[in-house]
Amino acid sequence: MASGGTGESGFTVEAAGRALEAACGDVGLDAAGARLVRLGSNAVYALADGRVIVRITADAEELAEVARTVAVARWLAEVHLPANRLVSGIAQPRVVQGHAVTFWESVQDDEEYATLPELADLLKQLHWLDEPEALALPYFDPAPKVRAGLAGLGAGVRPEDAAFLCERADRLEKEYGRLDFVLPFGLIHGDANIGNVLRNRAGRAVLIDLDDFALAPREWDLIQTALFYDRFGWHTRAEYASFVDHYGFDVMNWPGYEVLADLRELMMTLWLGGKAAAEPKAAEEFARRVESIRTGGDRHLWQPF
């Protein structure tokens, strides 16, 4: 396991490693040789056998949210929607050394994303489902996430940039409240984009990152793909057209598109701002994004992060 380093909220590699060893020991798994995949608000480890992914929260305060994610994953398995699966036979989530821990089946050996048509098909299948009341999913509201992002702007952010983003957030919150959505309200993934749909070992597309499931206007699940094509140039015209064709609705033709796109790119920028003090590359990308938002500049210069 790696040593050194600190994630968000002061979560260290050492603390995560101790929790990993204890949690694996509790359930009879071997933590030796585990690879740290990511350290942020969560630590994510791939066990050496290549079949299990372990997620560890920075503290147990997120236990309720983690328990909801576990419930979502179990329900998706029951309705046979292709998604990340929990390791069977283990009571989850587990609280170990003050951290909430979950164990997931590894989707693949080598990172391979699925296609936009496959993402559209999965979203269409998901959006047709009626959510069970037992999941107690929250109603989606962008305001708390935006406000948390603003509060998380650190020492690496100039005061004038923070003030500009705060003013923009105020305006977008009001505009969001006036939107007239046209798609049915219901279950959403919450962070639907090409980075959250992987191809598994059997060659099938599966949804991952189930933390943001909520009840909301379905337009929110379509906005990132449109934004990545329209403003960032991360998808081609043909790729986006295939997404629209498979889902059956083009959110870019809806009058509220610009407001949702502005909100999503603001959230993406605030997330980077929270990393700016500790990560020079994040600070550089954050500054680039703020300047382009302020001036109406070309978002094609934005880099995935």
Predicted regions and their residues:
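A cross-family kinase active-site recognition segment
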Residues: 110-163, 183-185, 215
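Active-site activation/catalytic loop segments of kinase-like enzymes and analogous catalytic loops
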Residues: 218-251, 263-280
